[in-house]
Amino acid sequence: MKDKLIIGRFLPLDTVIHRLDPRAKLIFVFLFIIIIFFSHAPLSYLWLALILLTVTKLARIPLWFLIKGLLPVFFFLILTFMMHLFLTKGGTRLIEWGFITIDSNGIREGILIMLRLGFIMIVSTILTLTTSPLNLTDAFDRLFKPLKYIKIPVAALSMMMSIALRFIPTLMEELDKIILSQKSRGSDISSGSLAARIKAFIPLLIPLFISAFQRAEELAIAMEVRGYDANAERTSYRILKWQLKDTLLIISLVPIAAVSLWLGHTF
């Protein structure tokens, strides 16, 4: 499980994407997700796929490694597609069998929503693979620093985000240990029907939650012993410097959005 889910991991490579300011990457991902939500045509998603492929190549992330990260959420994507397939009506009636009907709009919307969620997962994964959790936390803290003046605990939220990202691989590793422990006791969770596999997976949740709470308590005690204060003013060892390449990254969103909208309205 931990080898499949890659979001939250960091690949320490030396590429042009890794060297970008984490604030610029965070802004780019946020605006790129907005562009994804405003894209409603297949050609628009093909264009966005080319952009993601280019970024992946520049970051030297193996394509198979990135696609493998979608496998844990593949069931969720298929479930989303099936919901739109049967619930979205309109267009040409393709199948009608009793109360079950499938229309062309259902297939189209199901595919687009599945692509939309998949692209959001991919661009978020690229962000975590090319940005260390510490830099990501610093970027979040710097971008939302003005919110401190309206009493929003930005530093605490940044720390929570950093801990959450670090806990994802840890929890997946813990889940792997629990699965191996259950298999050694004769439990079979990898075969049978989908309902049987889901039923066999439910008993794993209780020890996983207990382990998560124990790790959270240990971390809280360790931070308290070291004198951590969420309200204290903090400094950073690494100073973030905004450069021309970071500005160009943000400007590149203009043609990306323009082409996506043009393809959506033209075809």
Task: Give residue spans per PLM region.
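Transmembrane alpha-helix interface motif
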Residues: 1-42, 48-57, 142-145, 149-152, ...
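Alpha-helical membrane-interface segments at transmembrane helix boundaries
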Residues: 63-67, 71, 108-112, 202
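Alpha-helical transmembrane segments and their membrane-interface exit regions
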Residues: 51-61, 75-79
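Juxtamembrane/interface alpha-helical elements of multi-pass membrane proteins
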Residues: 73-187
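Loop-to-transmembrane-helix entry motif
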Residues: 69-77, 114, 118, 208, ...
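Membrane-helix interfacial "entry" motifs
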Residues: 14, 37, 60-65, 97, ...
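Transmembrane helix-loop junctions in multipass membrane proteins, especially transporters and channels
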Residues: 41, 45, 60-64, 88-96, ...
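Alpha-helical transmembrane segments and their helix-start/interface "positive-inside/aromatic belt" motifs
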Residues: 25, 62-74, 249
